[in-house]
Amino acid sequence: MWMFPVAIACGNTFILKPSEKDPSPALLIAELFKLAGLPDGVFNVINGDKIAVDALLSHEDVQAISFVGSTPIAQYIYATASEHGKRVQALGGAKNHLMIMPDADLDQAVDALMGAAYGSAGERCMAISVAVCVGDNVADQLIGKLTPRVQSLKIMPGTEDKAEMGPLVTNQHLAKVRSYVGQGVEEGASLIVDGRDHVVDGHEDGFFLGGCLFDNVTKDMSIYKDEIFGPVLSVVRVQDFNAGCELINNHEYGNGTTIFTRDGDSARQFTHSIQAGMVGVNVPIPVPMAFHSFGGWKRSLFGPLHVHGPDGVRFYTRMKTMTSRWPTGIRTGSEFSITTMK
């Protein structure tokens, strides 16, 4: 969905294959393009499942493939499209961390986490799902401030003006997220806020889940290692700055991360040493402006070029080098020769 503006601006036609779980926005965009006068065939929508995907990956007229989704599917897209000679950018999963230093403004950090962890019910690739607290004092204060905020989240259909969090995308995904919460409890994490049994009046059969908050999460737990893609925030306690950076850098994903601190030296060291494609300082979600490139490192991205910015233009264009000579305009005596080994 993010790619078509750059692709079309660079002179390409574009085929959008949206998720079968969320097909409507793509069709609405196509209708708006039609009303705006975009010529037929420039922006196209194909709905379908893996059969449609495989057809695009192998079709000889498709020159480039962009994808955003889970890491296993991103790997499949990258390998299959590359095998068929396509240029590929495949954005995969994420486990985005927000590190909180002892000197941070905790109220700002809490506000940031409420939006970054629970906005869109945590169903976005840049959601913050891990809060890394430097020191037990920071963690204790953060939990104390977060708990009532998570408990009081206004959960209702997204069409309601007062809604702060809506439902999950499918009943199957709701069951999956609930299962992860159960795993976290079984593995020894402290479930501070349990939203598994949340019910919205009048929507008892809806795919609603309350916000969930864990403390004392460790790096070997499933809720830390896996991308849950739901309203579940894990608090991990570390003893110092270096331990926090090491924790983040050792994760298999390297999509985005951010630090909350008042210390410029800590911020500079963090931004230079952390192994992630998008890094923020005192911002909830480190999404860059569109004129910069968007994308992660490690198992969060497959392919050499990111989305948007200069990388986006490079991806949707091809380099052409032109060399010319105009003999009638060359001064007398000029010589052209190719260097040889003789």
Describe these PLM feature segments.
Residues 49, 68, 116, 261, ...:
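Conserved residues at the C-terminal ends of beta-strands
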Residues 13, 21, 50, 71-72, ...:
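Gly/Ser/Thr-rich beta-alpha loop segments that engage phosphate groups in nucleotides
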Residues 8, 15, 44, 89, ...:
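Structural detector of well-ordered beta-strand residues that form the stable sheet scaffold
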Residues 38, 62, 99, 154, ...:
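Conserved C-terminal structural/oligomerization subdomain of aldehyde/semialdehyde dehydrogenase
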Residues 37, 64, 72-218, 247, ...:
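ALDH superfamily catalytic-core signature
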Residues 55-56, 112, 247, 270:
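CheY-like receiver
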Residues 1-111, 238, 303:
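Rossmann-like NAD(P) dinucleotide-binding subdomain of oxidoreductase/dehydrogenase enzymes
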